[in-house]
C-alpha cells in the first residue's frame, strides 16, 4: 500500500459520509391536506360536497404538482380513520384543512360554512378555495 492510499481512502469515506448526510436531510416538507370526512351512507348533498371539495383542491394544479396540496376523502366508518373524529372534533360530514410542516400538523381548520354553501356550487368553490389559499400562504417559503 502506497503512502497516498490511506489518504485517498479517508477522503473517499469523508465524501461518502457527506453525501449520505445530504440524502438523509431532504428539504422540509410543507403542504396542506384538504380532507372531506364522511360516513359510508351518504345523501346527494354529501356526495356533492365531496365532489366540490375535490374540484376546489384541483384548481391548485401547480401546488398539487409540487406536492404542496393533497386531497383526501376519508370514511369515518373505516376503523383506521375513526381517530379523525376526535382529532378534529367531528360530528358529521366536514371539510377540514390541515397545514403540515415536516410531517407535523402545524394548524388545522374546519370549514363549517361548507354546509351553508353546498347548495350554491360557485360560492362553495370560492369559499373553499379562499380558505385553501390562506393555508398555502402560511406554509414556509420554498428555498430558491
List PLM regions with ranges:
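Thiol-based oxidoreductase modules, predominantly thioredoxin-like and allied folds used
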Residues: 65-80
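Bacterial N-terminal signal peptides that target proteins for export
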Residues: 1-11
Amino acid at each position: 500500500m502506497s503512502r497516498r492510499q490511506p489518504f485517498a481512502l479517508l477522503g473517499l469515506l469523508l465524501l461518502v459520509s457527506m453525501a449520505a448526510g445530504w440524502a438523509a436531510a431532504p428539504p422540509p416538507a410543507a403542504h396542506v391536506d384538504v380532507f372531506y370526512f364522511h360516513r359510508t351512507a351518504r345523501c346527494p348533498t354529501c356526495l356533492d360536497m365531496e365532489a366540490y371539495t375535490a374540484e376546489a383542491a384541483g384548481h391548485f394544479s401547480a401546488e398539487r404538482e409540487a406536492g404542496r396540496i393533497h386531497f383526501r376523502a376519508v370514511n369515518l366508518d373505516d376503523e383506521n380513520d375513526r381517530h379523525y373524529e376526535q382529532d378534529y372534533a367531528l360530528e358529521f360530514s366536514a371539510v377540514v384543512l390541515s397545514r403540515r410542516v415536516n410531517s407535523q400538523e402545524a394548524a388545522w381548520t374546519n370549514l363549517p360554512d361548507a354546509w351553508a354553501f353546498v347548495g350554491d356550487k360557485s360560492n362553495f368553490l370560492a369559499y373553499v378555495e379562499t380558505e385553501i389559499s390562506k393555508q398555502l400562504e402560511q406554509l414556509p417559503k420554498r428555498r430558491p
